[in-house]
A protein has these predicted regions:
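Cytoplasmic helix-loop-helix junction between adjacent transmembrane helices
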Residues: 100-137
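Helix-breaking motifs and short loop linkers at transmembrane-helix boundaries and internal kinks
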Residues: 37, 69, 90-96, 124, ...
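Paired small-residue
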Residues: 80, 84, 95-103, 293-301
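Extracytoplasmic gate region of multi-pass secondary transporters
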Residues: 25-26, 202-257
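Conserved MFS/SLC helix-loop-helix module at the cytosolic interface between two early adjacent transmembrane helices
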Residues: 56-94
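Helix-to-loop junctions at the C-terminal end of transmembrane segments
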Residues: 58-69, 255-267, 352
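Interfacial helix-cap and linker-helix signal at transmembrane-aqueous boundaries
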Residues: 32-33, 64-65, 149-155, 231-232, ...
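Helix-loop-helix hairpin linking two adjacent transmembrane segments in secondary transporters
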Residues: 125-128, 134-178
């Protein structure tokens, strides 16, 4: 296996674990709603707390990785969110659940910008873009794995055992320690500041990227954290909703792979716009669909376009900033995006609570 494929597998697996943890929450939500008698607004707050932690993690860990190195901080984020999942197994009520998920979110949100910066440090041009999109494609594998756990474990053993399984993934840190290469560029003398980030050269790219990240995360977390719950609200059983979500999740993979292929042939900004338009159209159709076939097709299209757009954005963001502030820039842009991730789940829950309807939420 050549060095690029080896690095892709190592970093991509860490990315997959991050996605698994985010996804598994969406499958827990219908169960904790019943267990603790929550309404939709309260359930939306559960999702929002994880996203708020991810906001803090993205902002903090991106900066720390510029100062202390990508590898160390990446390992630290994995340990943090995996061990907090162990604590989640013993959560006695929803307040404890939300507090623990906030801590989990710090690790989850910190890992992604650090992993992206680690890849971006080693490549340039089209190769960098393709490596970043392919790394992000492991997010789909995380969702698929979470869907399988949800389908085969949660209905029979409950959500706490699912949380325990995610905690075991902390052991992957030993793989990172042994096999992840040391940082491509030394960080010992790096004293990059936010002042550099907001210099005339970097300010406007940061602002525009942050705005796009906000929109993408608002829609992604507002939709996908609620996906199994929305299917239950449509009248499907828990088991059927989990199975349908698994089918929709598989569609993320071709979305990523096509984006990686097209990045070598098209302007990434135009490609991103195309994927975002596809996301909007698929979301509208999904919200208005009233039979299983259309729900599955629209849901698959939504997965295809939304996650493909995410991959393109992952590739575009670090390419616009120099190494010295790359982690800080990536973390800052994603932190603004995480505001959308905080608002999205809560807003969706509130809209459902005031009887706007599923079509209104997805439009």
């Amino acid at each position: 296996m050549d060095k690029s494929k080896r690095l892709l597998l190592i970093v991509g697996t860490a990315w997959m674990i991050d996605a698994l943890d985010v996804a598994i929450l969406s499958f827990m939500m219908p169960l904790i709603k019943t267990e603790w008698t929550l309404n939709e607004t309260q359930l939306g707050l559960v999702g929002a707390m994880t996203s708020f932690g991810m906001l803090i993690g993205a902002l903090l860990c991106g900066k720390l990785s510029d100062r202390f190195g990508r590898k160390k901080i990446l390992m630290g984020t994995l340990i943090l969110f995996s061990l907090s999942n162990l604590a989640l197994v013993f959560a006695p009520n929803v307040n404890w659940f939300m507090a623990i998920r906030f801590i989990t979110g710090i690790g989850l949100g910190g890992e992604l910008p650090v992993a992206a910066a680690l890849i971006a440090d080693r490549y340039t041009g089209t190769k960098r873009s393709q490596m970043l999109v392919l790394s992000d494609s492991f997010w789909a594998y995380g969702w698929i794995l979470a869907s399988l756990i949800a389908f085969f474990v949660i209905p029979h053993f409950g959500w706490r055992i699912a949380a325990l399984l995610t905690a075991v993934l902390a052991l992957y840190v030993f793989v990172l320690r042994k096999h992840l290469p040391d940082d491509a560029i030394t960080h010992k003398q790096n004293t990059a500041s936010f002042r550099q980030l907001f210099s005339p050269k970097h300010k406007w790219p940061l602002i525009m990227l942050s705005l796009v990240w906000f929109i993408v995360m608002l829609t992604y977390y507002g939709i996908f954290l609620w996906l199994p719950s929305v299917l239950v609200l449509r009248g499907f059983s828990i088991v059927h909703s989990l199975g349908y979500t698994l089918a929709m999740s598989i569609a993320q993979l071709p979305g990523y792979y096509l984006a990686a292929h097209l990045l070598a042939k098209m302007n990434p900004k135009k490609l991103l716009i195309g994927y975002l338009m596809g996301t909007i159209l698929a979301s509208l159709i999904f919200g208005l669909a009233n039979n299983v076939t259309i729900i599955l097709i629209a849901g698959a299209a939504l997965s295809f376009f939304d996650l493909g757009a995410w991959g393109i954005l992952i590739a575009l963001t670090p390419s616009l900033f120099p190494h010295a502030i790359r982690g800080t820039a990536m973390g800052s842009a994603q932190a603004v995006g995480r505001l959308g991730a905080v608002i999205g789940p809560f807003l969706a829950g509130w809209l459902l609570d005031i009887k706007v309807g599923i079509g209104g939420v997805f439009s």
